Amino acid sequence: NIAATAQIEADTVQTDHSVEFLTDGDNGTYWLASEDSASAVITLRFPELKNISAVVLGEYLPLGQHIEQGEILAGKNKIADFTVVGHKRICMFDPVQTEELIIKITSSRTEAALRLLEVYQES
């Protein structure tokens, strides 16, 4: 899992639920989008090119299962779509070299709450 090596930011966040909680390995902490947000964008910037082949997402289920749809981009190129995240959604795709990985939540019943974001590279 190389997500923790990236600089990470989100276009929406609630106080006390930082985007850094996505990669801290603690199932009790979580990133939470701003109230009434039906979409969100999380951007990871790596210090060098990475050969990425999988992304794992996990919702913070005590708040409910809200994420319905999203996509993953390497820079500006879409590399995967995903639907309901729930406890864990594993998104595998052909390896792609990038310094920037973007997770777009395009549809959520209410504000998204993610406890987990993992990124794996092809060895």
What is the predicted role of each segment?
Residues E35-S39, K50, L61-S123:
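Trp- and acidic/polar-enriched beta-sheet ligand-binding modules for extracellular glycan
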